[in-house]
Regions:
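Hydrophobic alpha-helical transmembrane bundles of multi-pass membrane proteins
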Residues: 1-290
Length: 290
């Protein structure tokens, strides 16, 4: 519907999403939101008064490196959204002329703006790097048409709001462990709506409807529905079958110990996962050993 030049959203509404902010990210983000609703929060995530406790990952440097690898992959993913035709011309997925440099540089500008925007509102390294993803996703619909400066500002603005969206989910006791909805769902939705503002009136090829705000907004609603409705139905069915989440004891010990079983860090844990108490070394003993 939205990825091909003959798609109904493209032909009738002028839907423009060359970087798949809706077709990929919104569908995945809203699917994740639906699953989170049925899955419920992790043990210990919320207090009786509704306040949230932080459950952080085991290594912030590893998390940041992982996010950087995802961002590097985005340049390949988005670069794959354009085609080099036999006539020595780059075209986007809709058959319109574009350039590889436009995609690459606007991706970089969205990433840079996203880093700054998310850091300004969160002051957290994890959300700063996640903001880079939000920035790229938010400019994805118009990578072929945006000015680089505009791409930077869009990425910064949307990424600044993303941590606040995740905090809003916590108010409703929705535990999105990695911020999938705030990054992909909200980032894709905001990107499509904003592209409808700045790209409204741009013509399409072969007599198709021109890009419009209502077309982009309508396309965003369609993509949200295509993600949320199946996600809710599938997760609800799995919940009723009793297989949506692991038992409480497995959640507390970790799946590495209960399912594999294997220990990620055996040097720091006993055979049943209890922390090993380190033997204190006296200064005199350490000197004697030397």
């Amino acid at each position: 519907w939205g990825c091909q030049r003959e798609g109904c959203l493209r032909g009738k509404w002028g839907y423009h999403d060359v970087g798949a902010a809706g077709v990929v990210h919104m569908i995945g983000g809203f699917f994740a939101l639906a699953v989170v609703i049925n899955l419920g929060a992790r043990i210990g995530r919320f207090n009786p008064d509704g306040s949230a406790n932080a459950i952080v990952g085991h290594s912030m440097p590893m998390s940041v490196v992982g996010l950087m690898l995802i961002i590097v992959g985005f340049f390949g993913f988005l670069g794959g959204c354009i085609i080099y035709s036999s006539g020595a011309q780059w075209i986007n997925i809709y058959g319109q002329p574009t350039t590889l440099s436009a995609f690459a540089f606007n991706t970089l500008m969205g990433f840079a703006g996203g880093l700054i925007g998310a850091y300004l509102t969160s002051r957290e390294p994890y959300w700063m790097m996640s903001g880079g993803l939000v920035g790229i996703i938010s400019v994805a619909p118009g990578l072929d048409l945006y000015h680089p400066g505009l791409a930077y500002l869009i990425g910064m603005g949307v990424a600044a709001v993303a941590p606040l969206v995740n905090n809003l989910l916590l108010k409703f006791r929705l535990d999105d462990a990695v911020g999938a909805f705030a990054v992909h769902g909200f980032g894709g939705f905001a990107g499509l709506v904003i592209s409808g503002i700045f790209l409204s009136g741009y013509p399409n090829m072969n007599g198709m409807a021109e890009i419009s705000f209502m077309g982009q907004l309508g396309g965003a609603v369609v993509m949200a529905s295509l993600g949320f409705i199946p996600g809710y139905a599938v997760s609800w069915a799995l919940k009723k079958a009793g297989v949506l989440r692991v038992p409480a004891h497995a959640e507390e010990r970790g799946l590495d110990l209960t399912e594999v079983p294997a220990q990620a860090y055996p040097e720091w844990s006993g055979i049943y996962g209890e922390p090993v108490k380190a033997k204190p070394v006296m200064i005199a003993e350490s000197k004697a050993a030397v």
